[in-house]
Amino acid sequence: MRALIQRVLEAKVVVDGETTGEIQHGLLVFLGIGREDTLATGQKLIDKILKYRIFDDEQGKMGWNVSQANGGILLVSQFTLMAQTQKGLRPDFGPAMPPSDAKALYEQLVEYTRSQFENVQTGVFAADMKVHLINDGPVTFNLEVEA
């Protein structure tokens, strides 16, 4: 499972002209689910994201996690993160979990994240989403947990 996390000043997801999720200061998390991923894999990655210290502390160093920074999380599914890109000129999405299975796992991970953290917003699984954000830094990291 892979996550691309970005520290943002604000972010929102719009589907068909309607805002489906919006945060101010916090983390925009794009989540890619692979064929072999499980709920346990996802929980491990979510736990890492919640504890990952990429917010400035009182000394101006990256010492605080999203909770300590009083931020929010905008969680967006993105199967393209699982693409194989080493060969050729077209991404291969074979490593991504099939949509029906991925949707169920994504929904479980949303619920898990909400059980661990109060301010969680989401996109819409498999929708054509418009993601608006203002990067803070920019500060962007790729996180991965093997199944």
UniProtKB/Swiss-Prot annotation:
GO molecular function terms noted in the UniProt entry: D-tyrosyl-tRNA(Tyr) deacylase activity; Gly-tRNA(Ala) deacylase activity; Ser(Gly)-tRNA(Ala) hydrolase activity; tRNA binding
Compartments, as annotated in UniProt: Cytoplasm
EC number: 3.1.1.96
CDD domains, per database record: Dtyr_deacylase
Reactions catalysed, as given in the entry: glycyl-tRNA(Ala) + H2O = tRNA(Ala) + glycine + H(+); a D-aminoacyl-tRNA + H2O = a tRNA + a D-alpha-amino acid + H(+)
Annotated GO CC locations: cytoplasm
UniProt short sequence motif Gly-cisPro motif, important for rejection of L-amino acids, positions renumbered to this chain: 137-138
Domain of life from the UniProt record: Bacteria
GO-annotated biological processes: D-amino acid catabolic process
SUPFAM superfamilies from the UniProt entry: DTD-like (SSF69500)
Listed InterPro entries: Daa-tRNA_deacyls_DTD, DTD-like_sf
KW Lipoprotein (keyword) present: no
Gene3D superfamilies assigned: D-tyrosyl-tRNA(Tyr) deacylase
Entry's family note: Belongs to the DTD family.
Assembly and binders: Homodimer.
Domain statement: A Gly-cisPro motif from one monomer fits into the active site of the other monomer to allow specific chiral rejection of L-amino acids.
Function: An aminoacyl-tRNA editing enzyme that deacylates mischarged D-aminoacyl-tRNAs. Also deacylates mischarged glycyl-tRNA(Ala), protecting cells against glycine mischarging by AlaRS. Acts via tRNA-based rather than protein-based catalysis; rejects L-amino acids rather than detecting D-amino acids in the active site. By recycling D-aminoacyl-tRNA to D-amino acids and free tRNA molecules, this enzyme counteracts the toxicity associated with the formation of D-aminoacyl-tRNA entities in vivo and helps enforce protein L-homochirality.
Name recorded for this polypeptide: D-aminoacyl-tRNA deacylase
Record gene name: dtd
